[in-house]
Amino acid sequence: VIVPPEGYLKQVRELTDAHDTLLILDEVQTGLGRTGTMFACEHEGVVPDIMCLAKALGGGVMPLGATVATRKVWEKAYGGLSKAVLHTSTFGGGARACAAGLVTISKLVEENLPERARDLGEYFLNGLRTLQKSYKTIKEVRGKGLLIGLEFDKPVEGLLDKLTAGAINEFAKEYYASLVAGELLGKHQVITAYTLNNPNVMRLEPPLTVTKDQIDYVLNALEDIFSQRKGLLRMALSVVTKKP
């Protein structure tokens, strides 16, 4: 979960325009209200030529993906009979999935869920940054709206770290976030996971309907885990021996 610096997307848009290149954005995870606007690119007022959507588009009840394009791109691909069959799909147009997508978009707009994600995301981030001040193992808190990453750093310090020449912390880089996630699930019934491209980062992506009380519950659960200051071995044992 890396938030690009302000102005990054605008510069990308300028570069693609300068070189007459299409700008294609993948908003499968960031789109549909997750970051506090309907689409993440709206934070910088950028309009892509093509946008990829999925996951939340189905409202959690139907698998649905979509490739959305500007009229100019659409006309280029499908604007005449000679072009209409150049781009096809062997599986698409599911009526029930599309109906779920339409209802999902309607609910996002009617219930102001992007704005809700913006406000509750700020509340969540502030709570996590307060935790960070108390626990050095939290290296960084970052995110936008309700797309949040919690990166960990050196859960072991002092003599043990020196005796192992830092090896135990190298081990922790691969497993600490998953151990924290395991504690959250086993002890507090909170489902989360580490990120695939950095196993030392835990993703926090609650539903856009999450409440402040539920966010507080997660913050208190993390406080409980960090305050116990368990070693890696104890944490691993508590995760694998936890009875369902």
Where are these regions (language model features)?
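Conserved N-terminal phosphate-binding loop of PLP-dependent enzymes in the Aspartate aminotransferase
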Residues: 1-244
